[in-house]
């Protein structure tokens, strides 16, 4: 799995947390947080990050319900991922992100950060949790894929 840098996104209503893997796709790290609006600008920023960082794959956290079903927010994220997939030449995959924001907030609270600092970092930390979970799952089951098809236009 050498030279496979993977970018992960935690897509929210206002912000998109971004995390990146090391070149061996083993370790995830928070990268940045970008504004979700307007979506066209957010997608352009993600495309630029993919190009600048030599990313080979993008993972988008899919906010399923606790029962594993798609709710309204999952559909919004899916549409965003579909649009992003059309703008990129690398694969885009969806990955279950249940409870990652809760885990990120707890992790930041445990570090003793103040609420304003937590708010500033929670999205990218959640993205790094999504990415680390994805990397771990991929190592244990390398044949599983949630890749989105690219549009042919």
UniProtKB/Swiss-Prot annotation:
GO annotation (BP), single: rRNA 5'-end processing
A GO cellular component entry from the record: cytoplasm
Organism per entry: Chloroflexus aurantiacus (strain ATCC 29366 / DSM 635 / J-10-fl)
Similarity comment: Belongs to the YqgF nuclease family.
Protein name: Putative pre-16S rRNA nuclease
PANTHER family: POLYNUCLEOTIDYL TRANSFERASE, RIBONUCLEASE H-LIKE SUPERFAMILY PROTEIN
CDD domains xref list: YqgF (cd16964)
Subcellular locations according to the entry: Cytoplasm
